[in-house]
Design a protein with these regions (language model features):
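The beta1-alpha1 cofactor-binding region of Rossmann-like NAD(H)/NADP(H)-dependent oxidoreductases
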Residues: 5, 22-34, 66
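Substrate-binding pocket helix/loop in short-chain dehydrogenase/reductase
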Residues: 59-61, 65-73
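Active-site loop immediately N-terminal to the catalytic Tyr-X3-Lys motif
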Residues: 62, 111-115, 173
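Active-site helix of classical SDR
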Residues: 84, 120
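Alpha-helical segment proximal to the catalytic Tyr-Lys
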Residues: 89, 133-134
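Residue(s) in the substrate-gating loop at a strand-loop-helix junction
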Residues: 104
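C-terminal helical subdomain
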Residues: 144-148, 163-211
Length: 218
C-alpha cells in the first residue's frame, strides 16, 4: 500500500493476521526487497492482486502533460510487471497460486481522453492472457478483472484531489461499490482450483460502451 495511516488502521483491526508494507510499485528494487524480506508466515504468497493504478490528465493526447503519461505507464504497466516478476517464481515453485490483474473497460473500449490510460489497461489485458498461456501446465490461475464505474478514489485522483469531482462525474448514476467489486473478485477466487476465470468485465447497469462519435462537415 501507499498510505501508512490506512495500513496501520487495518493492522490494528486485524492484528497478527495482517502484515503491511508501504511500497511504491514503480520502484523495482523496493518491490524485490519487499517480497524477499517477508516474514515466514507471509512469505508464501498464494494470491496476488495487482490493483495499483491511476488515471491522470484526461484531455487530448497532445495537450496533456507528458509527466502524467509517464506516471501512468510507470504505475499501471511497470508496477504490474515488477510485482508479478517478484512473486511468480514462488508460485511456480509451489505449483499453486492465483494472480488477479485489475484492468478496466477503458482498456477494451475507446474513450476520448483515455489514449494513455486506456493503452496501459490494454497492456494489462494482454499481459494477463499471455501470462496465462505461458503458465499452461502449472496449477496457477491468472485473471483480469475489467470494471467500469466503481466507487473508489479514481475520479478524485484524476481531478487532482478535488473531492467534489466524484459526485459530479457520477451524478444520477448508481455505480458499483468497492465491496461489490471485491465480492466479484472473491467469486473468481472461490471457483474450483481447476477453473480459471480468464476475463471478467463488469459495469453498473447505468453504464455501457455505446459511444459512437461522428464528425460532420458544415
Amino acid at each position: 500500500g501507499r498510505r501508512a495511516e490506512r495500513l496501520d488502521s487495518l493492522r490494528q483491526e486485524l492484528g497478527d493476521r495482517l502484515h503491511t508494507s508501504v511500497l511504491d510499485v514503480c520502484d523495482r528494487e523496493a518491490v524485490q526487497q519487499c517480497v524477499a524480506s517477508l516474514p515466514p508466515d507471509f512469505a508464501e504468497i498464494s494470491v496476488l492482486i495487482n490493483n495499483a493504478g491511476l488515471s491522470l490528465g484526461g484531455g487530448k493526447f497532445q495537450e496533456d502533460e507528458l509527466d502524467d503519461m509517464l506516471t501512468m505507464i510507470d504505475t499501471n504497466i511497470k508496477g504490474v510487471v515488477h510485482v508479478t516478476h517478484a512473486v511468480l517464481p514462488g508460485m511456480i515453485e509451489r505449483d499453486r497460486g492465483h494472480i488477479f490483474n485489475i484492468g478496466s473497460v477503458g482498456g477494451v473500449y475507446t474513450v476520448p481522453g483515455n489514449s494513455i490510460y486506456g493503452s496501459t489497461k490494454s497492456f494489462v489485458h494482454m499481459f494477463t492472457l499471455d501470462l496465462r498461456a505461458e503458465l499452461l501446465g502449472h496449477h496457477i490461475r491468472v485473471s483480469v478483472l475489467e470494471p467500469g464505474a466503481v466507487d473508489t478514489e479514481f475520479i478524485e485522483v484524476r481531478a487532482r484531489g478535488d473531492k467534489t469531482a466524484r459526485d459530479r462525474h457520477y451524478k444520477g448514476m448508481r455505480i458499483i461499490s468497492a465491496d461489490e467489486f471485491a465480492d466479484i473478485l472473491f467469486y473468481a477466487y472461490s471457483l474450483p482450483p481447476h477453473v480459471n476465470a480468464n476475463i471478467i468485465e463488469v459495469m453498473p447497469t447505468d453504464q455501457n460502451w455505446n459511444r459512437v462519435a461522428i464528425h460532420r462537415e458544415t
